[in-house]
Amino acid sequence: MIDRIQWLGHGSFLIQGPPLIYINPWRVASSTFHADVILISHDNYDLCSVADVNKLRGENTIVLGNEAVQEQIDDVELLRPWQARTFDRASIKGIPAYSIKSMRYPKEAGGLGFVISLNFYDIYYAGNTEMTPEMERIQPDIAILPINGDGALDVPGAVDVVKKMHPRWVIPSHWGSVGEGATREDAKAFKDAIGGRATVVISEQTR
């Protein structure tokens, strides 16, 4: 399953199921294949892009997000924390994503992460979040974790999450772009800190 997850840069991912799932598409190329499902975790401009959703959206595409996302993008179906939806062979559950140490992403804003259960694997996309008590309930096979800090997990925080969740694979996100706050060196430092606890996949940027 790990080879069917493609990092598109920043917080954007493509999961090739079926169904075809995009998470937070931003600055993506237009595709001849419409998404089956598009997941939007927060209402930030770099995660909630109307233009990018429209590039990927077809007549039957389902877009899921919180109430703030609904205010920015037309025809978004509401997904609440711990609510699960099923599409084809995938189950998608909303997970609270928020800051504790700072007010960058307050819990009241309703930010989401996602647990995507597909082909007998549980994939956890953390979103913009620090370590939260809700993570105690998640034991994924694959974890996608930010490492850029700024109200979300930084490298030490992401390492602590891996120690708590024990995933088999981890993909660091939110690094390498201009103004990102985390670099390839940070991604490598994260991999070194994880050691043998999990397999860390440092993807090549597609843009």
Language-model segments: which ranges?
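Short, acidic/turn-prone active-site loops that include or flank metal/cofactor-
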Residues: 27-28, 44-45, 68-70, 81-85, ...
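Active-site metal-binding motif and surrounding structural segment of the metallo-beta-lactamase
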Residues: 26-71, 139-144, 166
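Short amphipathic alpha-helical segments and helix-helix/interface helices
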Residues: 12, 50-57, 113, 135-136, ...
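Metallo-beta-lactamase
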Residues: 115-182
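Active-site regions of enzymes building and remodeling cell-envelope glycoconjugates
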Residues: 35-41, 61, 73-92, 141, ...
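Core dinuclear metal-dependent hydrolase active-site scaffold
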Residues: 1-33, 78-138, 153, 204-207
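Binuclear metal-ion centers of metallo-dependent hydrolases, dominated by the metallo-beta-lactamase
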Residues: 5-6, 74-87, 108, 136, ...
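Redox-cofactor binding/interface segments in oxidoreductases and associated redox assembly factors
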Residues: 23, 39-40, 93-97, 145, ...
